[in-house]
């Protein structure tokens, strides 16, 4: 088996003019390789170690050049386990960076860091390859117009809107609905924007990656009958992989997303789960590469590595990559260098709350903790901004009153506060919404709610026009008209029971 061949500028396969070296040192996932004088590979070139281990099994380990050491030696990081490697083994310089398949043929498939399919569905039907190391788009290519990326999810669009071509941090513990929210976003971008998604599983649990794949097949995001109809490509470099793979798998996913943006001119959603593991993998190999550790033991190149990934995620005049990144916060310390460096790049945060999930309000997005730089009157308009601020004020006041309600009960509140609490509870329930991808589990059809409809609904609740409706009428509905229809149905049902 050979790694995906790359071609040099002349179109000649680099394997035809082999540049051979030898392994001279192995320290865990890091190898030193000696090459003949004058034939040194460039930094980021792909190398392949070939040979046989002690029991005669073939070895084929891809590496990436990280440092030129002098004395005709280079230091490289392995992309797979280095078990069985010995000094003196032959190393082939590919003459180009790791290249991965791109284009429509990647949809519905699962890849590893090298762009090799790992889903047992045969080879990928494409000859289009792209190197994982590229420079960010030039400033003149960027689309600097600020525009909102409508998701069709009420709580997100109203209170913490996403920027088209922006970066969003997704915070939440286990079991609060991260995966379902991610799948709904993948579904909605395909329906509303004709876009596709790329999911990069960076250093997370293999079981979760498998569960996500199964759930995507179940909900139709991946179409098993006609794989080309799928809406997402998956790239996994999970916890069991060596740090080299976890450090580069984010770039593999990003490269696939860039092709959809630049060549197909589509809107793309790029999911990275988890951006912290990207930093963690870099820190694991940093010391082995001989770099002095920086604050809290992280690599000294932390900001540069993060910047080189994040700056490629942007809107150009062709299309956009909007990125949603799950952020693990070690020991809940927001000042830790890894999350602190990530925050500098984010345009919005979506915080999932266990309290809301426990109440059964899904999506369990915390309306007061979630933020967005887009929520400004000059960007979203006065009407949207005013409505969002009034919703937040109402919910904040309700939060302040909850202790009093718990101790003394609702009756001890003033008339004004009782009215505010009733509206806040309606708002809280109206922020819930049935999802398309959860239809299989809930039985209720999913709803995509446009931004104008969302604003109209919350304005009606705030104005007091719907004070007479029961609060359960607002739970798990789409737009406000469905809430009024549900209220009428509830009334009819209660009359029939009488």
UniProtKB/Swiss-Prot annotation:
Provide the reaction this enzyme catalyses.
Answer: ATP + H2O + 4 H(+)(in) = ADP + phosphate + 5 H(+)(out)
The record's annotation in Pfam families points to: ATP-synt_ab, ATP-synt_ab_N, ATP-synt_VA_C
Entry EC no(s): 7.1.2.2
GO molecular-function annotation terms? ATP binding; ATP hydrolysis activity; proton-transporting ATP synthase activity, rotational mechanism
Q: Which domain of life is it from?
A: Eukaryota
Residue sites binding ATP per the record: 172-179
GO BP annotations of the record are: proton motive force-driven mitochondrial ATP synthesis
Leader sequence range is none
The record's principal subcellular location, in a coarse class, is plastid
Is-annotated flag, keyword DNA repair?
no
Q: What InterPro entries does the entry give?
A: AAA+_ATPase, ATP-synt_VA_C, ATP_synth_F1_bsu, ATPase_a/bsu_AS, ATPase_alpha/beta_chains, ATPase_F1/V1/A1_a/bsu_N, ATPase_F1/V1/A1_a/bsu_N_sf, ATPase_F1/V1/A1_a/bsu_nucl-bd
Annotated membrane topology is: Peripheral membrane protein
Query: What keywords tag this UniProt record?
Result: ATP synthesis, ATP-binding, CF(1), Chloroplast, Hydrogen ion transport, Ion transport, Membrane, Nucleotide-binding, Plastid, Thylakoid, Translocase, Transport
Where is the protein localized?
Plastid, Chloroplast thylakoid membrane
Q: Write out the GO cellular component annotations.
A: chloroplast thylakoid membrane; mitochondrion; proton-transporting ATP synthase complex
Q: How does it assemble?
A: F-type ATPases have 2 components, CF(1) - the catalytic core - and CF(0) - the membrane proton channel. CF(1) has five subunits: alpha(3), beta(3), gamma(1), delta(1), epsilon(1). CF(0) has four main subunits: a(1), b(1), b'(1) and c(9-12).
- Protein purpose: Produces ATP from ADP in the presence of a proton gradient across the membrane. The catalytic sites are hosted primarily by the beta subunits.
Q: Give the record's family classification.
A: Belongs to the ATPase alpha/beta chains family.
NCBIfam families listed in its UniProt record: atpD
Q: What is this protein called in UniProt?
A: ATP synthase subunit beta, chloroplastic
């Amino acid at each position: 088996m050979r790694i995906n061949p790359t071609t040099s500028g002349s179109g000649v396969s680099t394997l035809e003019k082999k540049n051979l070296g030898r392994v001279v040192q192995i320290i865990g996932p890091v190898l030193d390789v000696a090459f003949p004088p004058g034939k040194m590979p460039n930094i980021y070139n792909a190398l392949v170690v070939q040979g046989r281990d002690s029991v005669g099994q073939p070895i084929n380990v891809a590496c990436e050049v990280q440092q030129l050491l002098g004395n005709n030696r280079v230091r490289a990081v392995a992309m797979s386990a280095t078990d069985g490697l010995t000094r003196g083994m032959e190393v082939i310089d590919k003459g180009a960076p790791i290249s991965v398949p791109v284009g429509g043929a990647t949809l519905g498939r699962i890849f590893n860091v090298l762009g090799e399919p790992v889903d047992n569905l045969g080879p990928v039907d494409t000859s289009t390859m792209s190197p994982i190391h590229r420079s960010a788009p030039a400033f003149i290519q960027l689309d600097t117009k600020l525009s909102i990326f409508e998701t069709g999810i009420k709580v997100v669009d109203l209170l913490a809107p996403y920027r088209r071509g922006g970066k969003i941090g997704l915070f939440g513990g286990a079991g609060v609905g991260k995966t379902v929210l991610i799948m709904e976003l993948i579904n909605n971008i395909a329906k509303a924007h004709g876009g596709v998604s790329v999911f990069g599983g960076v250093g997370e649990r293999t079981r979760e990656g498998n569960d996500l794949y199964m759930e995507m097949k179940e909900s139709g995001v991946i179409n098993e009958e006609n794989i080309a109809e799928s809406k997402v490509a998956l790239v996994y470099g999970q916890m069991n992989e060596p740090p080299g793979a976890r450090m580069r798998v984010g770039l593999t996913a990003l490269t696939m997303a860039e092709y959809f943006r630049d060549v197909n001119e589509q809107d793309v959603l790029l999911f990275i789960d988890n951006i912290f593991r990207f930093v963690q993998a870099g820190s694991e190999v940093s010391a082995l590469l001989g770099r002095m550790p920086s604050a809290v033991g992280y690599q000294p190149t932390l900001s540069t590595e993060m910047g080189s990934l994040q700056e490629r995620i942007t809107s150009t005049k062709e299309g956009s990559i909007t990125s949603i990144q799950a952020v693990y916060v070690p020991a809940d310390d927001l000042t830790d260098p890894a999350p602190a460096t990530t925050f500098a790049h984010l345009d919005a945060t979506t915080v999932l709350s266990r309290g809301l999930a426990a109440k059964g309000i899904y999506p369990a997005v915390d309306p007061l903790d979630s933020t967005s730089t887009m929520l400004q009157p000059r960007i979203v308009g006065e009407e949207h901004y005013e409505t969002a601020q009034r919703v937040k004020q109402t919910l904040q006041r309700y939060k302040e009153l909850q202790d009093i309600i718990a101790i003394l009960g609702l009756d001890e509140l003033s008339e004004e506060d009782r009215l505010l609490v009733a509206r806040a509870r309606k708002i809280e329930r109206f922020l819930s919404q049935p999802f398309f991808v959860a239809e299989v589990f809930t039985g209720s059809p999913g709803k995509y709610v446009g931004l104008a409809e969302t604003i109209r609904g919350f304005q009606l609740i705030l104005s007091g026009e719907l004070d007479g409706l029961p609060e359960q009428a607002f739970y798990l509905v789409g737009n406000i008209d469905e809430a009024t229809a549900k209220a009428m149905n509830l009334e009819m049902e209660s009359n029939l029971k009488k």
